[in-house]
Regions:
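Phospho-regulated, Ser/Thr/Pro-rich intrinsically disordered or coiled-coil terminal scaffolds
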Residues: 1-4
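Active-site-proximal "nucleotidyltransferase
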Residues: 7
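Leu/Val/Ala/Ile-rich N-terminal alpha-helices, chiefly Sec-type signal peptides and the beginnings
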Residues: 10-31
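General "foldedness" signal
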Residues: 23, 27, 119, 410-414
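Long, hydrophobic alpha/beta structural blocks
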Residues: 29-365
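Extended, charge-rich low-complexity regions and/or helical-solenoid scaffolds
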Residues: 367-368, 378-417
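C-terminal helix-loop subdomains that flank or include functional centers
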Residues: 373-377
């Protein structure tokens, strides 16, 4: 599923376009006990409930593709008899009306979802009549196929915050009654996937709210798919690989680490169109080798980083965009700006020193030097009495009479008068 596929589904989650046929749910406590289960025709829900459940469904299709949203493929063994994919196919075919299948699904989630607290399992059934589109994306009034799918959302349920409130039955302000509130989804999935505006029964879309710690136990045991790194996991893992080798306790290591990020960012093609998706650039071990070399990482350390990188990521090669941390790019830009300012200040100091350095003849070391005057004269004692001021062409001037063949130096430049 790409961004267009996800947005096409998500845009339909509103009152006038929604086609959800049924909603089923199971409320589970912290001890994994089923507190209650329910099943409803979606369009029969009360208006407030209708919109709340729609908001939950939208959240499962929210976030960044490759980070919060992952495309997962089913292994061949899961597509055979008794496999997870076959079970989900049967659940979809039942349109959530088979109670035994629903109970089996809830048990599957409870047994394979690790969460310390109460939560609500929600499953939606939908049948989307996919309209044919022309090459310029205009819809034609004819059906291309019916995309029938399940959307599952697993939402944490927590007590509302304590506080004071108006107790109407007692007509006073007192402790507010705390109740259990359903939160936004922590985990979810869509089966089958909607790829290139068509049903893909060999794949599903997985959603995680926390990209740093997705529920891989549910991916592997609940859905029967191989877990994948999120973009956040790839970025943090790569940073740890580099820091473990080059260190992070001194300024030199930090500068090297930041330069590696800059060079990775240079791999990403620049585009002025902010809506356009950047072309994914795979960062293979050989690419890492080039980046490390360009950044000035010593060969022995570079080899360790490359080997560890290849062992951890294997065939699941990250793209450059997933490894780059915008915050670190900003830090490095400020660091380079500061270094450039320091360099400019040093150059200015050197230029000032050269400008102010005027040769002093022997015996004149006792002449007081000061930087508060615009003009500083150093002359032989016998010429002091000859110096006088005079108005010339309306301009006040300092006149120093010069004898034939006398020499003068102005700002260190020798002049013969």
């Amino acid at each position: 599923m790409n961004k267009k596929d996800i947005l096409e589904l998500k845009r339909r989650f509103k009152k006038e376009a929604c086609t959800f046929t049924r909603l089923c749910g199971c409320y589970v406590d912290a001890d994994r006990n089923k507190i209650t289960t329910f099943g409803e025709t979606f369009l029969n829900l009360e208006e407030e409930e209708f919109y709340k459940y729609l908001e939950i469904a939208k959240k499962v299709l929210s976030g960044t593709l490759g980070n919060n949203i992952l495309n997962l493929e089913f292994p061949l063994e899961e597509e055979g008899s008794g496999g997870k994919q076959q079970f989900l196919m049967g659940l979809r075919a039942s349109a959530l009306k088979n109670e035994e299948l629903m109970e089996a699904f809830f048990d599957l989630v409870i047994d394979n979802y690790s969460y310390a607290g109460n939560y609500l399992i929600l499953v939606y059934h939908d049948a989307y009549d996919v309209m044919t589109k022309t090459s310029d994306n205009n819809k034609l009034d004819e059906s291309e196929e019916v995309y029938e799918y399940l959307l599952c959302a697993i939402c944490p349920v927590a007590l509302s915050k304590p506080g004071l409130g108006y107790r109407e039955d007692e007509n006073r302000i007192g402790p507010r009654i705390r109740d259990w509130v359903v939160g936004v989804p922590d985990t979810g999935f869509v089966f089958p996937a909607f790829s290139d505006r068509s049903t893909d029964i060999h794949s599903c879309m997985f959603y995680t709210k926390d990209a740093k710690a997705p529920h891989n136990e549910f991916v592997e045991s609940g859905l029967g798919c191989n877990s994948k790194f999120t973009a956040t996991e790839q970025k943090l893992t790569f940073q740890n690989i580099v820091k473990d080798v080059i260190g992070e306790d001194d300024a030199e290591s930090e500068a090297l680490f930041l330069d590696i990020h800059d060079n990775l960012n240079n791999l990403i093609p620049f585009t002025e169109d902010e809506t356009a998706e950047p072309e994914p650039i795979p960062v293979t071990p050989s690419t890492i080798s080039s980046v490390l070399s360009e950044s000035g990482v010593p060969d022995d350390k570079a080899q360790v980083i490359e080997k560890t990188y290849e062992n951890i990521f294997g065939e699941e090669v990250p793209i450059a965009e997933h490894l780059v941390d915008p915050k670190l790019l900003e830090v490095n830009a400020k660091r380079k700006e500061k270094l450039e300012l320091v360099h400019q200040v040093e150059n200015l100091k050197q230029q000032l020193e050269e400008t102010r350095s005027v040769p002093v003849e022997d015996g004149e070391d006792d002449v007081p030097a000061t930087k508060t005057y615009d003009v500083i004269l150093r002359v032989k004692p016998e010429k002091v009495e000859q110096i006088h001021s005079q108005i010339i062409n309306g301009q006040k001037c300092l006149v120093i009479p010069m004898d034939e063949n006398e020499h003068a130096a102005v700002n260190g430049i020798n002049t013969t008068v």
